[in-house]
Regions:
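Active-site-proximal flexible loops/turns
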Residues: 9, 66, 266
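Alpha-helical transmembrane segments and their juxtamembrane interfaces
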Residues: 12-13, 69, 441
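Outer-membrane beta-barrel porins/channels
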Residues: 20-34, 39, 119-531
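Outer-membrane beta-barrel translocator/receptor signature
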Residues: 37, 49-58, 64-154, 238
């Protein structure tokens, strides 16, 4: 039985909209470098190493280390896996929703690296010995994800929450031709598709198609329903880099990048409810007839593209005795973003004459946001021609992310920017790598982890481990192979908001919370030629 606290829900909904925009900014700002198979196999701990085209986006001075020109291309596969199951709200651990543990996955092909550097020898024995020019494309983020969750529920419903959210909005307005100009699109889709409807003669009070209304005004879920949540995310972020490197006396290596950060992101999710027994969901019509709820499906999709220009500067110092020291700094990126989104909904009853469908228009909006400054340091030690070990530290303060707008949305973005400063802070990233050479072969391994950019986040955030093999011929050809496993932080997802409260505003029937665990395997093969 539900009693609703409308004002509280409106406050929560507004806060959630601001927070979502803040998290979108984080999603588009974070980097999880890929590159060549060699750099990936060694955990991308290349700030002090260089010599590999995968290292150029980490430290621009890396191009100057190799005393030759080279070309590489790296095809790769990503195997993404997710597990989803409900989280119990009770002390005894019982699950009133999403009780089934569901596994899902997807496989994507990509090209995380391609590039070429041209080395010019000045024929000097000291001073400026070599100059390198390069163009490299390296992948810096992968959004691939597939989620599927399913289970039974006998207490709450997506459509009940939607009905509460719609309270106070006139049905005549929700059904108007220009409804999408004045009301939340999700609510308009819900009403026009038949997920919610008015009751009791009211024009601004709603009930879900799976709910029953009693004479005393109580509203309850009619019976058991099967609930399904699905999500599919694709896309990635790439850095297109123009590089200049310089070798000074085989002691100091300098480099600079002009980079273009390019991102594409696609998010598509749906929520579905089906009646276990439609007879439990009897709805009386004004004409004296009855209809029975069978199933509904609600879908939301979102796509974004962004691009921005930045500069990065780096240096590598080789003081001797096998020691190498590297450092790099990257300017903030001013990103121009265009995003598109839309909603659709369908409600089906046992008699198709009552079925309803609705589709929103396609939304489009453009804005700018600034990704923060980054800096990294590295130490490495080489064992002659036998191998190397390396370690990197990278720092990025995500509280410096910022939306910018000169239009009428300035107040909205000011609110989001305040949330960003409150929620996010510095992130510390550590990367470690090792390589051991056996003639023309090389054995490699790496590990990395990062702290959370959220100030109050508890638990592990993100880590990865990797290994690989390399082959270098006596001629110009070389090939590298790498595996990397990425382990991401747990996600707790609520498909709809709490809406059943007692007279004091306490939750009496908790809505579903889904625990989503995610990891992926990456397999890369680099083919390269030196000349």
């Amino acid at each position: 039985m539900r009693k609703t606290a409308i004002t509280f829900l409106l406050m929560v909904t507004a806060a959630a909209a601001y927070a979502q925009s803040a998290y979108d900014c984080l999603l588009f700002s974070e980097s999880n470098y890929e590159g060549t198979a060699r750099s990936v196999a060694m955990g991308n701990a290349f700030t002090a190493l260089g010599g590999d085209l995968g290292s150029i986006t980490i430290n621009p001075a890396g191009s100057a280390v190799a005393g030759y020109s080279q070309f590489t291309i790296t095809p790769g596969l990503t195997f993404s896996a997710s597990t989803a199951q409900g989280v119990s709200p009770f002390a005894d651990g019982s699950l009133p929703y999403f009780e089934r543990k569901m596994k899902s996955g997807m496989t994507t092909f990509n090209l995380p690296n391609m590039g070429m550097t041209l080395n010019w020898d000045t024929n000097r024995t000291s001073g400026l010995k070599n100059i390198t020019f390069g163009f490299v494309v390296n992948k810096s983020a992968d959004f691939s994800q597939d989620v599927y969750a399913n289970g039974l529920n006998s207490t709450t419903t997506f459509m009940g929450a939607m009905a509460v959210d719609a309270a106070g909005l006139p049905a005549s307005g929700l059904n108007a031709n220009d409804a999408y100009s004045y009301y939340p699109w999700s609510t308009v889709v819900g009403y026009q598709s038949g997920m919610i409807s008015t009751f009791g003669g009211y024009d601004d009070e709603y009930v879900g198609a799976s709910e029953l209304v009693f004479d005393n005004g109580d509203i309850v879920l009619g019976g058991d329903i099967d609930q399904t949540y699905g999500r599919r995310v694709t896309g990635g972020k790439f850095d297109y880099v123009f590089n200049l490197g310089a070798n000074v006396s085989d002691f100091l290596y300098l480099g600079a990048n002009i980079g273009i950060s390019s991102l594409d992101y696609s998010y598509d999710d749906y929520f579905k409810e089906s009646a276990i027994d439609p007879a439990d969901f009897e709805i009386a019509l004004d004409n004296g007839k009855y209809m029975y709820f069978n199933q509904m499906k609600y879908r939301y999709w979102y796509e974004a593209e962004s691009s921005g220009v930045y500069a990065k500067f780096g240096a590598i110092l080789t003081p001797g005795y096998g020691l190498r020291i590297g450092a790099a700094v990257q300017t903030p990126i001013v990103n121009n973003v265009t995003e598109w989104w839309g909603y659709s909904g369908s409600t089906e009853f046992t008699s198709s004459e009552y079925d309803g469908y609705a589709y929103s228009p396609e939304g489009e909006y453009s804005y700018n946001f600034v990704s923060p400054f980054r800096a990294n340091l590295g130490l490495a030690y080489t064992f002659g021609k036998f191998g190397v070990i390396s370690a990197d530290y990278e720092y990025c303060d995500y509280s410096q992310m910022k939306f910018t707008s000169s239009g009428g949305d300035r107040d909205y973005f000011d609110e989001v920017n305040n949330i960003i400063k409150d929620v996010f802070g510095p992130q510390n990233i550590w990367r470690f790598g090792a390589e051991f050479k056996l003639g023309t072969l090389a054995l490699r391994g790496g590990y990395g982890f990062s702290t959370s950019p959220e100030r109050h986040f508890e638990g592990p955030y993100r880590s990865n481990f990797s290994f690989g093999l390399g082959y270098s011929s006596n001629g110009s050809f070389f090939a590298d192979f790498a595996f990397r496993k990425n382990i991401y932080s747990n996600e707790y997802y609520m498909p709809y908001s709490d809406y059943i409260f007692d007279d004091e505003g306490n939750i009496t029937e908790p809505v579903p919370e889904i625990l989503i665990t995610r990891s992926d395997w990456k397999v890369l093969l680099t083919l390269g030629w030196r000349f």
